[in-house]
Amino acid sequence: MKKTLYEKIYDAHIVHEEKNNASILYIDLHLLHEVTSPQAFDSLRIKNRVVRQPKKTFATMDHNVSTESKDINASGSMAKIQMQQLIRNCNQFNISLYDLNNPKQGIVHVIGPEQGMTLPGMTIVCGDSHTSTHGAFGALSFGIGTSEVEHVLVTQTLKQQRLKNMKIQIKGKIKNFVTAKDIILFIIGKLGTSGGSGYVIEFCGDVIKKMNMEERMTVCNMAIEMGAKSALIAPDETTFLYLKGRRYSPQGKFWEEAVKYWKTLITRSKAFFDKEFTFDVSNLSPQITWGTSPDQVLSINEKIPDFNFFKDSVKKNLARSACDYMNLKPGSYLTDIKIDKVFIGSCTNSRIEDLRSAAKILKNKKISKNIKAILLPGSGTGTVKKPAEKEGLDKIFIDAGFEWRLPGCSMCLGMNNDKLSDGERCASTSNRNFEGRQGRGGRTHLVSPIMAAAAIYGRFIDVRNLDSETN
């Protein structure tokens, strides 16, 4: 039988399998952060258990951290408790921790790949839904719950049902100013937030092949917003070039052996997929979400749809509810929407290529005085903040009026100091826009880094026309 990439990785990690039942899979890499791990470690202590493979377990602080200070007290008492507990847990169980004093500290789904922890063919888990990001390297990666975190800590295995295979081929010649974020938002808009439920999605096609690793990570990161368990892109020369020489990547003769194996991690011709889709993105424009779900998305030059556009009564009611919450009227143009804040960051779009693309838009420009704009590099001295400062990107952002912050999840979620106030509207490069995601009453519009940068005049602007716009 011809196997898909997913089936190859799944089968290679089976520890135990019973007919018509879930398999027990070996887990190659377990990533932790301060929010979803404390209860798991407490349970280990109560049951007098140890971590089976501490060298295959890595932790970082990202969700709760202050992005204005490295002071553990800066994010409030609850955040401090969670971070202190993570320090205690990692010390007791001999787990490597990227804490606030570690210059390599950053967002978990940024530091994993940049340090070479993430490798093709691996199984990777984390107590975070956007673990699908690592699938960009041809790794089977997915988010898990706290009870599963405990199970992996103790056994280095996890019970998993086989999932269905979905293939999404992306073809066409991308126009200027259209990004990976636009492509994946467009696909989510077509398939819906449950379109990938029960599936592992493999992305392929000429457009994917031409993407750099940062762009591929954006695509796989957002696959979870289609309801998919995981996403995969077959490793190729782009993957190998990114990984070579990184701290935890194989070295010397082991590198050559690894690449030889990684080249076998492709879906065989005529392998079976339960569903297949092909999208031509040749005529795609920059995308922006208008509602409270990632699939409520339009091209920047379109109008908010009339409720009668939706034939399905559920979608019609959701659209009406979204417009009420977002304070938008059907028939209004997206370019008429005024914003209060700009956020460039998150595990979706805080990597060096994201910063470079936004900096090109912002060079020699100034944000409006009524706008607050913050930029969050995804990591410290790894591949983002320090390299960006060496290139002078920080100066471009600061000169434009942005706050150049420390690594962390920040305004992606209303869990730290960086929140929207009630009624505030944000152009955000994050991944979720449900009610209150960025703060109670906050209104989130998901966009690419360059579209976020183009919103500097206090409203959404088609980045392709930015030079013709004025304050």
Curated annotation (Swiss-Prot):
Q: Which Pfam families match?
A: Aconitase (PF00330)
Cofactor(s) listed in the protein's UniProt record: [4Fe-4S] cluster
Q: Which reaction does it catalyse?
A: (2R,3S)-3-isopropylmalate = (2S)-2-isopropylmalate
> What span is annotated as the signal peptide, if there is one?
none
Q: Which InterPro entries match?
A: 3-IsopropMal_deHydase_lsu, Acnase/IPM_dHydase_lsu_aba_1/3, Acoase/IPM_deHydtase_lsu_aba, Aconitase_4Fe-4S_BS, Aconitase_4Fe-4S_dom, IPM_dehydratase_rel_enz, IPMI_cat
One molecular function GO term is: metal ion binding
Listed A to Z, the keywords are: 4Fe-4S, Amino-acid biosynthesis, Branched-chain amino acid biosynthesis, Iron, Iron-sulfur, Leucine biosynthesis, Lyase, Metal-binding, Plasmid
Q: How is the cofactor bound?
A: Binds 1 [4Fe-4S] cluster per subunit.
**Pathway in which the depicted protein is active:** Amino-acid biosynthesis; L-leucine biosynthesis; L-leucine from 3-methyl-2-oxobutanoate: step 2/4
Q: Please verify whether the record's keywords include Transmembrane.
A: no
Q: Name one GO biological process term.
A: L-leucine biosynthetic process
- Enzyme Commission (EC) number: 4.2.1.33
What parts of the sequence cross the membrane? none
Superkingdom of origin organism? Bacteria
Q: Which SUPFAM superfamilies match?
A: Aconitase iron-sulfur domain
Which positions does UniProt annotate for [4Fe-4S] cluster binding?
A: 347, 409, 412
> What is its biological role?
Catalyzes the isomerization between 2-isopropylmalate and 3-isopropylmalate, via the formation of 2-isopropylmaleate.
Subunit details: Heterodimer of LeuC and LeuD.
Family that this chain belongs to? Belongs to the aconitase/IPM isomerase family. LeuC type 1 subfamily.
PANTHER family named among the record's database cross-references: 3-ISOPROPYLMALATE DEHYDRATASE, HOMOACONITASE, MITOCHONDRIAL-RELATED
The molecule here is called 3-isopropylmalate dehydratase large subunit
Gene name per UniProt: leuC
